[in-house]
Amino acid sequence: DLHLVTKIQPYPERYYDYAVSAGGAAPKQFSQENLFEYHLYSLDRTTDLKDNETKQISLLSAFNVPVQKEFVFDGAANGTDVQVKLKFKNSQQQGLGVPIPKGIVRVYKEDSSKQLQFVGEDSVDHTKTDDEVRLFLGNAFDVSGERIQTESVNAAKGLYRNSYEIVLQNQKDTGMEVIVAENIGQFGSVTKFSDPFDKKSATKIEFKVKVPAKGEKKVSYTVETRTYYQ
């Protein structure tokens, strides 16, 4: 019998496999139950291991999972790459709804001939039921960006002004939304901006902008940073 007990541990753990895809129903391989403050997963079928063999077994498969795809550009961290991310909720309504231990999530999508094709994978941490799951699947092929610093001024004692322009290019035949993520620093304050933005934390802002098909979109902003002297 094969059992997996998952708990948060202070030492490195093994990674386990999950699959998220579109298509028909998936056969159930593991049953799950609570065990003290942990979760016990039991393999519902037999499996054979040869001498010194290592085998990967998919712990959980879910099909037709509704996901939201995001294109994210962070020029300071990733150069010209626009990252492709997926997010979904680990709920029964989404075809999931079970505690997920730390592991690898592989994503598949049907092609025009209804064959499942592997589109990417990412690691996830321990995920509770109804938590949101975010996956980074790679970089967009037809979308890119460039981040340019257009101004850097010491405006006054302890006051610095920096301006940036972000140029997004879309070679797709359809328009798309791109999230521009910027870090303005702990003491930064945005004083000018070309497009509305959301302040995600004390140091991070995000612009959500539309980039036309076969076109480009420019985003600019100015941030003032004050240094406090003792």
PLM feature spans:
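Long, intrinsically disordered, low-complexity accessory segments associated with secretion
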Residues: D1-Q230
